[in-house]
């Protein structure tokens, strides 16, 4: 992986918003998920830097991006406002945009509200809502993993009371992390260790938890005009094929790709498939 360059700029309200720039070629703006996590977990985005100039945003309150003064300022409209300021900072009339997980929800909101600003859109392991169908699929995926040695602790972590401090939240998040993989073994545990020490922003997670029950973007998706790729892992326990199918049906002309033997961390579980599918779509 080439050396990356950490860059930043001042937002209209005086915060520093930072991003990592690496690679060469057409610009691909990447909004990671979490929320509240830095994009360190995405690594080099499956080597897409070999084909594109990656602009990997540190969302507000993560990495080298300042936290807003208001601890509640982590709503989707807040994130899309930052994304628009990033586009303006880059001096681009249109952007190719990849949103991953929570970042995929941000990307949907942005592309639906500003369709003229998005040239191509990649929605990776994300969803338009977490309704009954999605919740049922998640529960089935959790039960499918019940025989794993890590299951008891990971499942318990998801049922405990909400922790208070950022460190407690990070501990809970990492205990539950094995669910994000189709297979969780020593290699996956070693990968988690590479970013286990990254700070986590509990405020962002708390706001997201409040928004989830009412999240439903289906009525907005017809406004998206950019060619769109919807990609997820076959074994993704939270944003899997059920979520992908709903997105694909609602976004005009969207293309769907389901990656076998991959969960929510498809970008690191099946990097070659992820790279090839995304690169082929963006250059087609």
Where do the model's predicted regions map?
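Acidic catalytic loop of the alpha/beta-hydrolase fold
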Residues: 235-239
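Catalytic active-site module of serine/aspartate enzymes centered on a nucleophile-bearing elbow/loop
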Residues: 254-284
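Flexible "cap/lid" loop of the alpha/beta hydrolase fold
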Residues: 121-160
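Active-site loop/oxyanion-hole signature of alpha/beta-hydrolase fold enzymes
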Residues: 59-102, 276
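Conserved HGGG/HGGXW glycine-rich cap/lid loop of the alpha/beta-hydrolase fold
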Residues: 8-72
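Alpha/beta-hydrolase
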Residues: 150-219, 226
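Conserved hydrolase catalytic core segment
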Residues: 93-137
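Short beta-strand/loop motif that positions the catalytic acidic residue
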Residues: 224, 230-232
């Amino acid at each position: 992986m080439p050396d990356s360059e950490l860059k930043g700029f001042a937002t209209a309200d005086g915060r520093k918003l930072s991003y990592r720039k690496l690679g060469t070629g057409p610009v691909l703006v990447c909004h990671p998920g979490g929320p509240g996590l830095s994009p360190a977990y995405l690594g080099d985005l499956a080597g897409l830097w070999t084909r594109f100039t990656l602009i990997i945003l540190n969302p507000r309150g993560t990495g080298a991006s300042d936290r807003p003064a208001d601890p509640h300022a982590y709503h989707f409209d807040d994130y899309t406002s930052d994304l628009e300021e990033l586009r303006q900072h880059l001096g681009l009339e249109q952007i190719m945009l990849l949103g991953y997980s929570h970042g995929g929800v941000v990307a949907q909101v942005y592309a639906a509200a500003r369709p003229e600003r998005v040239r191509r859109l990649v929605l990776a392991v994300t969803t338009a809502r977490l309704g009954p169908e999605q919740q049922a699929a998640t529960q089935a995926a959790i039960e499918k993993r019940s025989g794993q040695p890590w299951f008891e602790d990971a499942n318990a972590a998801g049922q405990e009371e909400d922790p208070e401090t950022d460190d407690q939240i990070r501990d809970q998040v990492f205990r539950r992390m094995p669910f994000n993989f189709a297979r969780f073994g020593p290699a996956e545990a070693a990968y988690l260790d590479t970013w286990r020490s990254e700070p986590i922003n509990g405020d962002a997670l708390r706001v997201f938890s409040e928004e989830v029950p009412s999240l439903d973007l289906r009525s907005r998706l017809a406004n998206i005009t950019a060619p769109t790729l919807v990609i997820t892992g076959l074994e993704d326990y939270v944003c899997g094929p059920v979520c992908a199918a709903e997105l694909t049906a609602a976004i005009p002309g969207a293309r769907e790709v389901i990656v076998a033997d991959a969960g929510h961390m498809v970008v690191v579980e099946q990097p070659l498939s992820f790279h090839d599918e995304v690169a082929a779509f963006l250059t087609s």
